[in-house]
From Swiss-Prot:
Gene from which this protein is expressed: hisD
Transmembrane spans: none
Name by which UniProt lists this protein: Histidinol dehydrogenase
Active site: E327, H328
Example GO molecular function: zinc ion binding
Cofactor note: Binds 1 zinc ion per subunit.
Quaternary context: Homodimer.
Function of the protein: Catalyzes the sequential NAD-dependent oxidations of L-histidinol to L-histidinaldehyde and then to L-histidine.
Similarity-based family: Belongs to the histidinol dehydrogenase family.
Record field: catalytic activity: L-histidinol + 2 NAD(+) + H2O = L-histidine + 2 NADH + 3 H(+)
Residues annotated for NAD(+) binding in this entry: Y131, Q189, N212
Annotated EC: 1.1.1.23
Binding site for Zn(2+): Q260, H263, D361, H420
Length: 435
């Protein structure tokens, strides 16, 4: 285990050094992965489940006769999940449901001028696919974060897939969240099967969920193909930035930094503070807590991507944070809501000492599927709207049309769109003949 001891004074750096200190771990543009994924997608499109079965043997080291998990197995999964975990999942489900139900938008119905009615309505996506990767432990929390809003949105078919064997906790969470079908399949081949369908696996309209480099590349490729599905986002390594002052609890900050660094060796954590005393306390606490963590070596590797930045004041912390545009932002200061007013770019924000990032990961109610790699500048956390589509409606009365007709003719003529102008003129002439 390496000793973490990285404090950098922001104002001792030149502009290039300041830029470099905020660089994220490089995501390699791997042409080998691109080519392999392209071949997998092509084989699934042509050979369907035959190719899917061969890839499952190759990558998952198991033979699957039937990819779909039976309803009986989904229901019986409850028997293999202990009650304390069921209770915790129930609490998380309740909070996530409450927060996402509050996101239901009302339709818009207005008259922009007399006789011109404009509406905006929201319709659920028909079929969505949820990908849950395998790992050291089952990621049932991601099932909740994706299946619950899909159900609230009214998606008619919710499909989940995960590499075999699928843990009972995943099956249990999927069942209580209203997932319709579950398939034992993983990797780029699973994304391709969801994207284009097979004999027994339905094609979906949009694919959600995280995964490794192959899954991410597959999502990118299928979404770029004509008639391919939409995707939620391309997830990068997880990241956390903390703004703290002398009033902050150093042990809390250290624990939060370590919890985020735990995600993967590519994770990045940053502390911004004007207090050198706090920075030193945090370093001591990080190294003390790290000794007691089972993944200390991996966390230490992630800390190589990480830094504590000493600033002249909190205003400078805000400026740096807005430049970095973190996935997760913790504001642990004396008056966090004053800082909040100045934050422009962050995917999910945690205020005060009692709001660890772990709360958002699991059970506060907000979604943990978030833009990374600075994308919070222009992108948002996953929400109910991602499972719906906006539809626009307009209805003009004859008088409303006449009132607007001259405007339409002038504008279409200015853009040299003769057929547009004619579509207006032919109606005007028709109405004049009736008078």
């Amino acid at each position: 285990m390496k000793y973490f001891n990285t404090i950098v004074n922001w104002n001792m750096l030149n502009s290039n050094e300041q830029k470099n200190i905020l660089l994220r771990p490089v995501i390699k543009n791997n042409n080998s992965i691109k080519k392999k994924v392209k071949k997998i997608i092509e084989n699934i499109q042509v050979l369907g489940e035959k190719a899917l079965r061969e890839y499952t043997i190759l990558f998952e080291k198991c033979h699957i006769n039937k990819f779909e998990v039976s309803k009986e197995k989904m229901l019986s999964s409850s028997l293999y999940v202990n009650q304390s975990l069921k209770d915790a999942i129930s609490t998380a489900k309740k909070n996530i449901t409450s927060f996402h139900t509050a996101q239901i938008l009302s339709p818009i119905d207005i008259e922009t001028q007399v006789g011109v009615r404009c509406q905006q309505i929201y319709l659920p996506l028909n079929s969505v696919g949820i990908y849950i990767p395998s790992g050291i432990a089952p990621l049932f929390s991601t099932v909740l974060m994706l299946a619950i809003p899909a159900k609230i949105a009214g998606c008619k078919q919710i499909i989940l897939c995960s590499p075999p064997p699928i843990d009972n906790t995943i099956l249990y969470a999927a069942n209580i969240c209203g997932v319709d079908k579950i398939f034992q399949m993983g990797g780029a081949q699973a994304i391709a099967a969801l994207a284009f369908g097979t004999k027994n696996i339905p094609k979906v309209d949009k694919i959600f969920g995280p995964g490794n480099a192959y899954v991410t590349e597959a999502k990118l490729q299928v979404s770029s193909i004509f008639n391919g599905p939409q995707i939620d986002m391309l997830a990068g390594p997880s990241e956390l930035l903390i703004i703290a002052d002398e009033a902050s609890n150093a042990d809390f900050i250290a624990a939060d930094l370590l919890s985020q660094a735990e995600h993967s060796i590519s994770s990045q954590v940053i502390l911004l503070t004007p207090s050198l005393q706090l920075a030193k306390k945090v370093i001591i606490s990080i190294n003390n807590q790290l000794k007691n963590l089972s993944k200390s070596d991996d966390i230490s590797t992630a800390l190589d991507n990480s830094v504590i930045i000493l600033t002249k004041d909190l205003f400078e912390c805000i400026k740096i944070s807005n430049i970095y545009a973190p996935e997760h932002l913790i504001i642990q200061t004396k008056e966090p809501r004053l800082i909040l007013k100045e934050i422009l770019n962050a995917s999910s924000i945690f205020l005060g000492p009692w709001s660890p990032e772990s709360a958002g990961d699991y059970a506060s109610g907000t979604n943990h599927v978030l833009p990374t790699y600075g994308k919070s500048v222009s992108s948002s956390a996953l929400g109910l709207c991602d499972f719906k589509k906006r539809v626009l409606i307009q209805e003009l009365t004859s008088q409303g049309f006449i009132n607007l007709s001259n405007t339409l003719k002038i504008l279409s003529e200015a853009e040299k769109l003769e057929a547009h102008k004619n579509a207006v003129k032919i109606r005007v002439d028709f109405l004049k003949e009736k008078i």
